[in-house]
Amino acid sequence: MSLLKKTVYLIIFSCLGCQIHAQKSELTSQLVSQYEQYKEPSLNMRRIKHEDITPLIKTLKNKPGVAIRQVGSSIDGRSLNLLSLGTGKTSIFLWSQMHGDESTATQAIFDILRFFTSPTANPTRDLLLKKLNLHFLPMLNPDGAALFTRRNTLGIDINRDALDLASPEGQTLKRVRDSLSANFGFNLHDQSRYYNTERTAKPATISYLAPAYNYEKDINEVRGNAMRVIVFMNELVQDFAPGQVGRYNDDFEPRAFGDNIQKWGTSAILIESGGYQNDIEKQEIRKLNYVSILAALHSIATESYKKISIDAYEKIPQNDRKLFDLKLEDVSYNLLGKMYTLDLGINHLEVENASHSAFYTKAQLVDIGDLSTYYGYETMNGAGYTVVPGKIYTPKPQEIPTYKNSIALLKKGYVYWKGRITMPEKGLNFPMQAVSDNFKLPDFRFYIGLNPSFLLSKDGVITHAVINGYLINLFKETSTFRNAIFLR
């Protein structure tokens, strides 16, 4: 090929790439700016249940162009519903929450359905409905959702039931997939908020995977198309969460639905919703699901994904799991009269109420030592700071704990508030650990599993407190503190 021809081809592909990028930017700007008008207001937390989405499905029955049919039932008898719309030739199947405690995409699905059923004029919506035949199966595991737990009532992981089909939920997913023979499938999950993008301190807010369909991890047209759409979504999400997209491990799992759906001929795309700074209920990540899924549908409807090279798929950084909620670096710690310098990794575990509708956090010390290859949502350089065990404060009669007086007590070395206090289901709203009248402080030492509550001093002055795993600067008003707990 002559130099002139090569130059011409480069110019053509460069212009084509610029055109695609410009179209994508315009589309995403539109989707983001309009999101709030389509967001389903009744869903605003992770712990949603079948009874929360049932009235939304009933409302959608009255919308023109929407077909709803019950395609199965869970073990406990909750309905599994398929919502279909669009008249196009390209069939797309989206399902969510096969793990009951992974609800971010379920919320996004109802945002997307509001987008599609809105009466206001929208050229993007019209194009998608004309080109695509869309099928949504939200909350595949409603029994697990009722308890906010991963597995179903049978106690199995539905995502490891693609071969045995022991569960009615797994049977339903297989039957629907086969009846649709969908061109594309979106397998929508949540992952731990402690995943980061490899070798960075950034959380893997969204992770993608085009699952392998064999141990060799071969790439055929079906899997290649899934990779192309993922590359498109990755470039889009980078605009809103730069460096916070990961690539899920693609080792073949012969029992998993995603891997088998890829094998059965549907281009399977796994989307995992991870963590995002100060977004415990994952509402920002929900928005990213909404935008990226609709943009992906647009790329399929216009077939623009076909112009994307799969080489960029491998360039998406892999997931790693090296995040803590709080990382303290190089703090000085006195043990048996000898000073040690070490790092601390602390995570916040969620403790649910009886109805699995609310929670408080109970922190745990999960790692100690050299944590230089780990990161934190919040990190403090503790060089020069010394760990100070806290004292118990006995309040005066009628004295009530508040945030303000707790800060004053922390500065004096008190960490524990003695007295009868009823703990709300979302925990105590003042930054001291409550203890009973007969509570005895054990000898202070760090160990894995400890609920970390202590003070930090510098040059003899107490400057910071760690209460139930939350770091509090005692001389600043801002803090990530969420709740303390009652220690018995």
Which role does the model predict for each range below?
Residues 77, 123, 257-260:
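Short beta-strand/turn micro-motifs at beta-sheet edges
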Residues 75-100:
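Acidic/His- and Gly-rich active-site-bordering loop/insert found
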Residues 3, 22-47, 180, 209-218, ...:
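C-terminal accessory segments enriched in acidic
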Residues 89-91, 98, 103-243, 262:
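Active-site/substrate-binding loop(s) of hydrolase catalytic cores
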Residues 71-73, 85, 96, 137-141, ...:
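Active-site-proximal beta-strand/loop segments in catalytic clefts of secreted hydrolases
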Residues 1-26:
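Bacterial Sec-dependent N-terminal signal peptides
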Residues 68-72, 121-126, 244-250:
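Surface-exposed patches in mature extracellular/periplasmic domains of secreted proteins
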